[in-house]
Amino acid sequence: MKTQDIAQRWLDFFAAKGHTVVPSASLISADPSILFNIAGMVPFVPYLSGREKAPYDRATSVQKCIRTADIDEVGKTVRHGTFFQMCGNFSFGDYFKEGAITFAWELLTSSIADGGYGLDPSRLWATVYVDGTEKDEEARAIWRDKIGIPEERIQGTGKADNFWSTGQPGPGGPCSEIYYDLGAKYGQEGGPIVDETRYIEIWNLVFMQYQLSAVRSKTDFDIAGDLPNRNIDTGLGLERLAMILQGVENLYETDQVRPVLDAAAELAGKDYTSTVDPADPHHADDVRLRVVADHIRSALMLIADGVAPSNEGRGYVLRRLIRRAVRAMRLMGVEKPCLPALLPVSREAMKGFYPAVEEDFERISRIAYAEEKSFLRTIASGTARLDEAVTESKAKNQPLSGAEAFALHDTYGFPIDLTLEMAAEAGLAVDETGFRALMLEQRQRAQADSREKKSGHADLSAFNELLAQGQTVFTGYSELDGESAIRGLLSGGQPIAKASQGQEIELVLAETPFYAEAGGQAADTGLISGDGFVIEVLDVQRPVKDLSVHKAIVREGEVAIGASVRAAVDRERRHAAEQAHTGTHIVHAALHQILGPEALQRGSFNKAGYLRFDFAWGEGLSTATRSEIEEVANIAIRNNYSVQTTEMPIDEAKALGAMALFGENYGSRVRVVEIDGAWSRELCGGTHVDTTSRIGSLTLLGEQSVGYGNRRVEAFVGMDAFRHLAAERALVSELTEIMKVPSTQLADRIGATLAKLRATEKELDRLRKAQLTAAAGELTTKAQQVGKTRLLTHDVGQIGGADELRSLALDLRERLGSEAAVVALTGESNDRPMVLVATNEAARAAGVKAGALVKLAAGVLGGGGGGKDDVAQGGGSNVGQIPAALAAINQAVAAL
């Protein structure tokens, strides 16, 4: 039975039992605290935990999962894999232990004809929770009395294996696991408590029945009492069941994985033997083939779900998977790109249950192939240096130094895991501690540079002293002006007691309505005034956490520490910034609505009237897609959605599905901004309008790449959007006047005009080349004997480009024959001079080198250049020096 048929049979069985079939969620977890969905139950956590009411009483799914904690073990054993599929059935306050156990037994043991998997009941074992005096006798009784499993095939295990919790206070409960006996050749008799190689776990049934009040570890927790609603969460490993039903030795030989393994073996010219014995001569290659088979499938599925290679987070996991697969192939002798041969094989194996991998394969393959090419360049540049370093370290009988590992990372792009892997293969350890210390030092330098940019100074001691007096209280969420007092004055980062008119200062208030630049939102500006003085605030930064520093200039009077002030934010500018920030959230939600949840935020910036938003996406957006996004955004604005902000514990925010920027550090309490409830829900500390209609309108300006796998959209909002559209309308009107057509025909007329222009330019190029060719014969007569060679120097004037100049020079060199000859030509293109020199073999034998002559002439022209001894070219900036440049070449040749 094919894996996809096993999965479909699972869904059909539970659908017939009244379960709602829930499609697999993306591999990308909605929980910002984890990279990927690592288990089938993760998408159901809000329901299982009781934080949200489930929209169904029973559900079933086949969930895509990624786990990379044991990535280094992949291939070395036949049980570890990074991508897997978890079949699950869930009950939310409906059936409990007896229902879950009965369903599991029926599906596993019913015949194929009756819709089951047809497993031999005598080969199935069960475990139940037993830990000292705590025993799940209810589950044991169901297995024994209801199902009929002999007592000797029901074994008890403790908290470590048979009790589930979230790792924090909340729901928990005992588990019951189902094991399959693979047979005597796989190990000892005695059940799973004796040998989990022979007895393989296929299904785990979790009975959520307790409320845990404290969880200190997996085996140390307190049970507060029973849950009001008891839930069921089960998970069956699809690949493990496929292995059993397909009669193969391990997951690498199942129908979704083996084709890639075979294709890799054929490409490398290797025979796969399935060995896991390190002493076996085939072991190293078998491990590599298993790595390739696993990682190629994982990469395919990750890219399909919107992950793109990068140096952090999910993108780094994908990058590592691709690079490990490519390197495994190289270690088997395959140095050319291998993904074009292997990725389509994985697509064919997976498309039956996941049609998106075929529908989107053009994008998937483009991303994967580009990453492979990039990695091959990295290997080519860094491997030689690593080999040298390994040899030197071995000669000194020392590990590879942290400094060397850091240099490989910083200069050649070698990630530390690749250095560790390659060094280990050479039998050498790496000073990871030293490497980490240098990486930390680099980060600290970068952070110091960032702080210096924010404060204008490297020395932050004065700011830290002010912070010790108390944090800045921000009042700007609820008011735009208010009373305060000056707590600190600085100039050039140094404390001062007072400042007078015209002086640039940094000012710290006890409390302020001014928003300091943070979270992608630009700082407020405005005025701070007091008795006899006015200060203009130009910027607000936080050089140290919790301290707002106002960069300002004294416009009137004299100001001193301790003065009472009135701080007033520029209201119009703040409102425009709020329009942009709420607009950013709307664009984010619109991207998710049109592209899907994989369009993850990578960064954003918003200021008065303008926003930009960076997101993960592997290709450019079509004009139609951009229009859809813009329409969704403006519908949200027109609908006048309410914008609400709430502070809450971060766990509660996660449970609500609030989006966050992965990698950001959030405190235990966070601020959640909601637009129309769940339409948009994000963690955000910025300022916002109170209803979306206050934005007015939003106009996308365009979209572009900002690094591999990441895109950027920009937009105007409010009056800036209106002004932009008005300017566009005026431009269209002007163009219709120029082109003498209505606006509906403008694109066609401009296209036709450009086509004619290109045709004319092409004809001019042809005529110019023909003219040069015709003139070549006459030009050869201008060659003069200079020293030991015949030298032809000539300025051709306006020319199409360097290629034309080169073509003419080579033609002239050929016409001058085999005696020593040098051709030196100059020309002008786009108001800049060019020079090209060509020498024949006899001239080079006489000591004339084209590269040296071009370097000399280009220097005269105010530029540079060079090349080989036979042909070289250069350029400059001073067209008027062309005669002098040719004269310099003449003198240099004469001197040889």
UniProtKB/Swiss-Prot annotation:
PANTHER family found in the cross-reference section: ALANINE--TRNA LIGASE, CYTOPLASMIC, ALANYL-TRNA SYNTHETASE
Pfam assignment, any one: tRNA_SAD
One GO CC annotation: cytosol
HAMAP family reported for this sequence: Ala_tRNA_synth_B
Protein name listed in UniProt: Alanine--tRNA ligase
Protein function: Catalyzes the attachment of alanine to tRNA(Ala) in a two-step reaction: alanine is first activated by ATP to form Ala-AMP and then transferred to the acceptor end of tRNA(Ala). Also edits incorrectly charged Ser-tRNA(Ala) and Gly-tRNA(Ala) via its editing domain.
Entry similarity comment: Belongs to the class-II aminoacyl-tRNA synthetase family.
Obligatory cofactor(s): Zn(2+)
SUPFAM superfamilies, alphabetized: Class II aaRS and biotin synthetases, Putative anticodon-binding domain of alanyl-tRNA synthetase (AlaRS), ThrRS/AlaRS common domain, Translation proteins
The gene coding this protein: alaS
Source species, domain of life: Bacteria
Main location as per UniProt: cytoplasm
Organism for this UniProt entry: Renibacterium salmoninarum (strain ATCC 33209 / DSM 20767 / JCM 11484 / NBRC 15589 / NCIMB 2235)
CDD domains associated with the record: AlaRS_core
Cofactor note text: Binds 1 zinc ion per subunit.
Keywords: Aminoacyl-tRNA synthetase, ATP-binding, Cytoplasm, Ligase, Metal-binding, Nucleotide-binding, Protein biosynthesis, RNA-binding, tRNA-binding, Zinc
Top EC category: ligase
UniProt-listed InterPro entries: aa-tRNA-synth_II/BPL/LPL, Ala-tRNA-lgiase_IIc, Ala-tRNA-ligase_IIc_anticod-bd, Ala-tRNA-synth_IIc_core, Ala-tRNA-synth_IIc_N, Ala-tRNA_ligase, Ala_tRNA_ligase_euk/bac, DHHA1_dom
GO BP term (any one): alanyl-tRNA aminoacylation
GO molecular function: alanine-tRNA ligase activity; aminoacyl-tRNA deacylase activity; ATP binding; tRNA binding; zinc ion binding
Gene3D superfamilies reported for this sequence: 2.40.30.130, 3.10.310.40, 3.30.54.20, 6.10.250.550, Bira Bifunctional Protein, Domain 2 (3.30.930.10), Threonyl-trna Synthetase, Chain A, domain 2 (3.30.980.10)
Domain remark text: Consists of three domains; the N-terminal catalytic domain, the editing domain and the C-terminal C-Ala domain. The editing domain removes incorrectly charged amino acids, while the C-Ala domain, along with tRNA(Ala), serves as a bridge to cooperatively bring together the editing and aminoacylation centers thus stimulating deacylation of misacylated tRNAs.
Residues the entry annotates as binding Zn(2+): H581, H585, C684, H688
EC number(s) reported in the record: 6.1.1.7
